[in-house]
Amino acid sequence: MSTESALSYAALILADSEIEISSEKLLTLTNAANVPVENIWADIFAKALDGQNLKDLLVNFSAGAAAPAGVAGGVAGGEAGEAEAEKEEEEAKEESDDDMGFGLFD
């Protein structure tokens, strides 16, 4: 098990038990699990997590940026919509015809 993983799990155990996260407590847990961790790594993790509520971080995470919204207003005529569709089809054909010679099996 890597040092980072062991310290992360130890921090989660402490947070779940509602115990303050400190470098000594992180080292105690990792030593109990027979995972060798240098003191500096425990200090870094303890300082990074100081004042953080891990339960809130785990529960209230964001999955990333929202997808862009579609066009709200539609085109008022059928001809304009057809022209745009044809234009998109032409662009797709042009892109597919571009052979730069970088094929996988060339």
Curated annotation (Swiss-Prot):
CDD domains: Ribosomal_P1. InterPro entries: P1/P2_N_sf (IPR038716), Ribosomal_P1/P2 (IPR027534). The 4 small acidic ribosomal P-proteins from yeast can be classified into two couples of similar but not identical sequences. Each couple (P1A/P1B and P2A/P2B) is distinctly related to one of the two acidic ribosomal P-proteins P1/P2 present in multicellular organisms. N-terminally acetylated by acetyltransferase NatA. It comes from Saccharomyces cerevisiae (strain ATCC 204508 / S288c). Component of the ribosome, a large ribonucleoprotein complex responsible for the synthesis of proteins in the cell. The small ribosomal subunit (SSU) binds messenger RNAs (mRNAs) and translates the encoded message by selecting cognate aminoacyl-transfer RNA (tRNA) molecules. The large subunit (LSU) contains the ribosomal catalytic site termed the peptidyl transferase center (PTC), which catalyzes the formation of peptide bonds, thereby polymerizing the amino acids delivered by tRNAs into a polypeptide chain. Keywords: Acetylation, Cytoplasm, Phosphoprotein, Ribonucleoprotein, Ribosomal protein. Its main location: cytoplasm. One of its GO terms (cellular component) is cytosolic large ribosomal subunit. Residues 73-106 are annotated as: Disordered. This is Large ribosomal subunit protein P1A.
